[in-house]
Amino acid sequence: VSCEDCPDHCSTQKARAKCDNDKCVCEPI
């Protein structure tokens, strides 16, 4: 998942979107 789509991608998992080296990382809230 790209950084651009990260917020939407993570919100479905109720997680926080973070960008690491242009990769999407979801952090549990």
Curated annotation (Swiss-Prot):
Entry GO MF terms:
chloride channel regulator activity; ion channel inhibitor activity; toxin activity
Q: Where in the cell is it found?
A: Secreted
Task: Cite the record's tissue specificity text.
Answer: Expressed by the venom gland.
- Keywords in alphabetical order, please: Chloride channel impairing toxin, Disulfide bond, Ion channel impairing toxin, Secreted, Toxin, Voltage-gated chloride channel impairing toxin
Offer a single GO CC term for the protein.
extracellular region
User: Which superkingdom?
Assistant: Eukaryota
Matching entries from Pfam families are given as:
Toxin_6 (PF05453)
Q: List the disulfide bonds.
A: C3-C19, C6-C24, C10-C26
The keyword Phosphoprotein is assigned to this record? no
Q: Give the matching InterPro entries.
A: Scorpion_toxin-like_sf (IPR036574), Toxin_alpha-KTx_8/9 (IPR008911)
Tell what the record comments on domains: Has the structural arrangement of an alpha-helix connected to a beta-sheet by disulfide bonds (CSalpha/beta).
What further note is attached to this protein's record? Answer: Negative results: does not inhibit ClC-0, ClC-1/CLCN1, ClC-3/CLCN3, ClC-4/CLCN4, CFTR chloride channel, GABRR, calcium-activated chloride channel regulator (Cl(Ca)), Shaker, and Kv1.2/KCNA2.
Function of the protein: Specific and potent inhibitor of ClC-2/CLCN2 chloride channel. It slows ClC-2/CLCN2 activation by increasing the latency to first opening by nearly 8-fold but is unable to inhibit open channels, suggesting that this toxin inhibits channel activation gating.
Family, per the entry? Answer: Belongs to the short scorpion toxin superfamily. Potassium channel inhibitor family. Alpha-KTx 08 subfamily.
Can you say what this protein is called? Potassium channel toxin alpha-KTx 8.3
Species of origin: Leiurus hebraeus (Hebrew deathstalker scorpion)
